[in-house]
Amino acid sequence: MAVGKNKGLSKGGKKGGKKKVVDPFSRKDWYDVKAPNMFQTRQIGKTLVNRTQGQRIASDYLKGRVFEVSLADLQKDIDPERSFRKFRLIAEDVQDRNVLCNFHGMDLTTDKYRSMVKKWQTLIEAIVEAKTVDGYLLRVFCIGFTAKDQQSQRKTCYAQQSQVRKIRARMTDIITNEVSGADLKQLVNKLALDSIAKDIEKSCQRIYPLHDVYIRKVKVLKKPRFDVSKLLELHGDGGGKTTEAVVSAEGAVVDRPEGYEPPVQEAV
């Protein structure tokens, strides 16, 4: 048996001991996520990021984050036609504690998309790439299904290949004209109202009746060079603060941001 001191016991117990537990949230800050002014709901939530330390800037880690929000939440609407549309917003800049977002795409929920695919009908899909007036290159996916004639006794409503080609060409023409003739803000409004799909359904009635025509997905392939002034223009006053009309003593209407406080006067 070796004779000597036990170094572990002489130092007061096990090696390492109990480490001090540090709360990871103590090093993080909350930021408000702001949607562009084309939507009714401006603040869509909050996001968490590590506080700025040395060369690690918090805003650099916030830029590029993508947030997926239902259109019903963005428009404060309980219409079921809006609830299955998801809009993707990407963080492009940070002002104070506000993360300013821009449109980054649109998609349908999986349950809605799968519920539309049924037997005894023809699925027609068109994929179009077009550029907006302000330089955004988009890939638009459109989908539609042939409708059954109410007066017919047939179980199926299949379209001929020549009719499918005509409908797909009509879809491509309408989407190209709508996208290339509008800027991003106007296009997002059209997607929110689903006006493009309604125009396609109405235009294709003479070729073959359609139903469940939707813009299924929109992808942003290319963006113009980032311009802060254009992003601030999309967000109105920049920080997403709502302005209220204040009537001065002379009776003129003055727009002032929410939470405005007059400066303290040194002398009266």
From Swiss-Prot:
What is a biological process (GO) this protein takes part in? translation
Q: What is its main location?
A: cytoplasm
* Keyword annotations of the record: Cytoplasm, Developmental protein, Differentiation, Oogenesis, Ribonucleoprotein, Ribosomal protein
A GO term, aspect molecular function: structural constituent of ribosome
Query: Which GO cellular component term is one of those annotated?
Result: cytosolic small ribosomal subunit
* Region of interest called Disordered, as start-end residue ranges on this chain: 1-21
- Which compartments does it reside in? Cytoplasm
Which residue spans traverse the membrane?
none
Tell me where on the tree of life, at the top rank, the source sits.
Eukaryota
Q: What is the annotated quaternary arrangement, including any partners? A: Component of the small ribosomal subunit. Mature ribosomes consist of a small (40S) and a large (60S) subunit. The 40S subunit contains about 33 different proteins and 1 molecule of RNA (18S). The 60S subunit contains about 49 different proteins and 3 molecules of RNA (28S, 5.8S and 5S).
Function text: Essential for oogenesis; required for late follicle cell development.
Please give the family membership noted in the entry: Belongs to the eukaryotic ribosomal protein eS1 family.
Name used for this protein in its record: Small ribosomal subunit protein eS1
Q: Give me the gene this protein comes from.
A: RpS3A
